[in-house]
């Protein structure tokens, strides 16, 4: 038994020769064992629950995607097409087997992955039907209808959002007006002033008066400054010179008149001795001149005193 077990024990493979449809292994005990591909498929492992769910969701996603065939025109790029059809550049590359962006310029048409029930499939007459391939394709030609519809939908949505926002603001304003009943008059005045056109506001604004004493020049105009400079620089010196000349002439004439009126220095008169006539003497031949001489002496004496 022991020898038999040793003879029938596991032996390493000594040679492997490939064959068509199967492979053969030769062991040390010269026993041959063949395994076919069908036997190998019988041992396929089953996937777990999460992997099965992930595969089912991925298959559902692939079923939801439809490929639209679009002709490439001049000026088209991968980025512009991806923005137009709301898909990524990687999805477009994957659908068209593009390795680089330069391969895009060698194509005449492009497969674009879109959702099955999206606005892009609804706008076209050729609705995607179930085809033999797992994901259906439909050929389209680019028309401006899709862009216009997108613009109209986006503009309508933006208009609706703006209207909702304005309505909410109106409600808030109405609540504020109701809560502030005492100041309703002031609010009405504010609303009326806001509703008036801008031209009326410009007309109603009073003209701002400029301060006449504003600035470093104290509000003077340029002609006022020129007049002051002329008065200080020309008129004042001329008047001063004229006044000085007239004053000098008047002073000189005054001195000359005083000198002419004032008498010159007089020599002191020598008193002559009076000779009284003797009683017994004979009368002088000039006795008739004595009263005149006495009068002159009297005048000189008064002048000296």
UniProtKB/Swiss-Prot annotation:
Organism placement in taxonomy: Eukaryota, Metazoa, Chordata, Craniata, Vertebrata
Topology versus the membrane: Single-pass membrane protein
Gene this chain is encoded by: lysmd3
Species for this entry: Danio rerio (Zebrafish)
Name this protein carries in UniProt: LysM and putative peptidoglycan-binding domain-containing protein 3
GO-annotated biological processes: Golgi organization
SMART domains the record matches: LysM
Function: Essential for Golgi structural integrity.
TM helices/strands, residue ranges: 222-242
Pfam family, one: LysM
UniProt-annotated stretches for the region Disordered: 31-60, 121-156
């Amino acid at each position: 038994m022991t020898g038999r077990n040793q003879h029938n024990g596991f032996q390493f493979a000594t040679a492997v020769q490939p064959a068509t449809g199967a492979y053969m292994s030769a062991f040390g005990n010269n026993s041959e064992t063949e395994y076919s591909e069908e036997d190998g498929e019988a041992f396929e492992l089953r996937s777990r629950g999460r992997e099965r769910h992930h595969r089912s969701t991925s298959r559902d996603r692939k079923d939801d995607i439809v490929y639209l065939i679009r002709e490439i025109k001049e000026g088209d790029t991968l980025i512009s097409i991806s923005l137009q059809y709301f898909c990524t550049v990687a999805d477009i590359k994957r659908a068209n087997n593009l390795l680089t962006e330069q391969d895009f310029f060698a194509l005449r048409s492009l497969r674009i992955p879109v959702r099955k029930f999206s606005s892009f499939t609804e706008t076209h007459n050729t609705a995607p039907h179930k085809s033999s391939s797992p994901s259906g394709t439909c050929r389209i030609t680019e028309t401006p209808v899709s862009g216009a519809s997108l613009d109209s939908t986006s503009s309508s949505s933006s208009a609706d959002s703006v209207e909702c926002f304005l309505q909410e603001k109106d409600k808030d304003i109405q609540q504020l007006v109701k809560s502030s009943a005492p100041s309703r008059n002031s609010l009405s005045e504010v609303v009326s002033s806001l509703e008036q056109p801008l031209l009326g506001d410009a007309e109603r604004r009073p003209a701002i008066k400029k301060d006449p004493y504003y600035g470093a020049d104290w509000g003077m105009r340029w002609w006022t400054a020129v007049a002051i400079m002329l008065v200080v620089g020309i008129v004042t010196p001329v008047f001063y010179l004229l006044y000085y000349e007239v004053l000098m002439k008047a002073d000189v004439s005054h001195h000359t008149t005083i000198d002419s009126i004032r008498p010159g220095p007089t020599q002191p008169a020598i008193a002559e001795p009076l000779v009284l006539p003797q009683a017994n003497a004979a009368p002088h031949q000039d006795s008739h001149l004595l009263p005149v001489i006495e009068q002159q002496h009297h005048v000189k004496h008064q002048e000296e005193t």
